[in-house]
Amino acid sequence: MYLIAMGNAMVLPIFTKSLCGFSDTTYGVATIFGSLLSVAAALSAGKIYDKLGIKPMFIAGTGLFATFSVMGLFLSLDTPILYIAVIFAFQSVAMSTLNSPTTAMALSGLEGKERVDGSAIYNTLRQISSSLASTLSVLIFTLMGSNLSAVHSVYIYYLVVTIAIAAASALYLKSMKRQG
């Protein structure tokens, strides 16, 4: 999930300012709603996870990531700032929906000191994937010409990564179900 979210945090503002001509302030105001939704989703994610488990959270979060990736394919130079705000909101809620439950699931099988070490490893992997996401997104954007088709290429990358993560996670959850 960090392979997508942090890359979008780099590309969407570049698109908004450089290609659409909106100011930094306009973009900042447009993202407030998504940020507030993200907080609400993060606060409720733990309770939902406790009641329903990882599967519904995973389906919802992955579905939101796929939706925001497809929405990115419809960006144009005339895209209204409201559409950009909605894309950001989908991405923010998707991130919040998946972040806490995946962390809990990743660390739930560990005991004592293993949990501390597991948390450190998990956080390190998140930081690495965040850096990789930013680098890959900007690399694709730059190599494709820093124009509208480059933005579409980045969102195709996001969609492919979302599908790959969904498939790998589904296989993992299926194998966990067989073991447990």
Spell out what each predicted region is:
Residues 1-177:
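12-transmembrane solute porter fold
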